[in-house]
Amino acid sequence: MATMTKKKLISTISQDHKIHPNHVRTVIQNFLDKMTDALVQGDRLEFRDFGVLQVVERKPKVGRNPKNAAVPIHIPARRAVKFTPGKRMKRLIETPTKSS
């Protein structure tokens, strides 16, 4: 399974649409910056058919150290980003591909 990096994404979009990579890089970086800013402010990002990104509060909890299960580990409350895939994405991911 391959990893799609920002560099690969820029290259692919640049080739597909015959746009200079620097222009694509600027747009993608701006898009990522705006998404990050929105999440930091607590906004919910919804992309129809793709999914939803939102900040959730994780409650504090007690965990276990696998090397010494007798000693509890206190995990503090924190904020985290949660991604919920959209219907179309779920359907596409659940459908096996020919290469699988």
UniProtKB/Swiss-Prot annotation:
Histone-like DNA-binding protein which is capable of wrapping DNA to stabilize it, and thus to prevent its denaturation under extreme environmental conditions. SMART domains: BHL (SM00411). GO terms for molecular function: DNA binding; structural constituent of chromatin. One of its GO terms (biological process) is chromosome condensation. Disulfide bonds: none annotated. Belongs to the bacterial histone-like protein family. Coiled coil: none annotated. This is Probable DNA-binding protein HU. InterPro entries: Hist_DNA-bd, IHF-like_DNA-bd_dom_sf. The keyword Amino-acid biosynthesis does not apply. One of its GO terms (cellular component) is cytosol. It holds the Pfam family Bac_DNA_binding. Keywords: DNA condensation, DNA-binding.
